[in-house]
């Protein structure tokens, strides 16, 4: 039966793969994030889903990285969840918006201190000329922030992917897969139109 709300279906599948992941230790929050620069060069990488709701899918990143710069140039992105161990996949197309600063601050403060310091020291996606210098900088910053709260760098932000299209794929016998595609109504963001696609 096709559900009217794709977030409800996502939640159902996510909890299914989460139960399996408790046994096989594979991270169900891993998702491929595809971005595209203003000169139409695509790139993709794996990031981690931190939360989701009717408002969208949240992850955190360094906006000075390649993906950050590309999202600043072109806010249209795509996500893919490959949940092969339950024979399912979810594909999402949407646009990004920034998570409020206080939400980013709250999540940043919950991270291990080593990860917080790493966010200050890593010039993500830039050429690393000397790894020893990088390690030394981490040591210096560790001393600087010893027994002090570590503030969130301005460039380290939360991103919400607001879905405009969601496709759910389920493996079938003899490659007769099941595919449901949900698209948001352009006149009513609370309304989704759903169709079944050929495999």
UniProtKB/Swiss-Prot annotation:
InterPro entries: Pyridox_Oxase, Pyridox_Oxase_CS, Pyridox_Oxase_N, Pyridoxamine_oxidase_dimer_C, Split_barrel_FMN-bd. Its cofactor is FMN. GO terms for molecular function: FMN binding; pyridoxamine phosphate oxidase activity. It comes from the Bacteria. It is an enzyme of class 1 (oxidoreductase). Pathway: Cofactor metabolism; pyridoxal 5'-phosphate salvage; pyridoxal 5'-phosphate from pyridoxamine 5'-phosphate: step 1/1; Cofactor metabolism; pyridoxal 5'-phosphate salvage; pyridoxal 5'-phosphate from pyridoxine 5'-phosphate: step 1/1. Keywords: Flavoprotein, FMN, Oxidoreductase, Pyridoxine biosynthesis. Substrate binds at residues 50, 107, 111, 115, 175-177. It catalyses: pyridoxamine 5'-phosphate + O2 + H2O = pyridoxal 5'-phosphate + H2O2 + NH4(+); pyridoxine 5'-phosphate + O2 = pyridoxal 5'-phosphate + H2O2. The keyword Oxidoreductase applies. Its EC number is 1.4.3.5. Coiled coil: none annotated. PROSITE patterns: PYRIDOX_OXIDASE. PANTHER family: PYRIDOXINE-5'-PHOSPHATE OXIDASE, PYRIDOXINE-5-PHOSPHATE OXIDASE. Homodimer. Catalyzes the oxidation of either pyridoxine 5'-phosphate (PNP) or pyridoxamine 5'-phosphate (PMP) into pyridoxal 5'-phosphate (PLP). Belongs to the pyridoxamine 5'-phosphate oxidase family. NCBIfam families: pdxH, PRK05679.1. This is Pyridoxine/pyridoxamine 5'-phosphate oxidase.
């Amino acid at each position: 039966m096709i559900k009217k709300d794709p977030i409800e279906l996502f939640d159902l599948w996510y909890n299914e793969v989460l139960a399996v992941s408790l046994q096989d230790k594979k991270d169900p929050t891993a998702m491929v994030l595809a971005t595209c620069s203003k000169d139409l060069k695509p790139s993709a990488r794996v990031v981690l889903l931190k939360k989701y709701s009717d408002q969208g899918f949240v992850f955190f990143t360094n906006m000075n990285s390649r993906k950050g710069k590309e999202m600043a140039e072109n806010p249209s992105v795509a996500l893919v969840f490959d949940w092969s161990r339950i024979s399912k996949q979810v594909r999402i197309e949407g646009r990004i918006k920034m998570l409020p600063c206080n939400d980013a601050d709250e999540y940043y403060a919950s991270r291990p201190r080593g990860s917080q310091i790493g966010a200050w020291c890593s010039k993500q996606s830039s050429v690393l000329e000397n790894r020893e210098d990088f390690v030394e900088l981490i040591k210096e910053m560790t001393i600087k922030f010893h027994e002090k709260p570590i503030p969130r760098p301005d460039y380290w932000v939360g991103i919400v992917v607001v879905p405009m299209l969601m496709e759910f794929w389920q493996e079938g016998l003899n490659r007769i897969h099941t595919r449901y595609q949900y698209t948001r109504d352009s006149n009513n963001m609370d309304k989704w139109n759903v169709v079944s696609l050929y495999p």
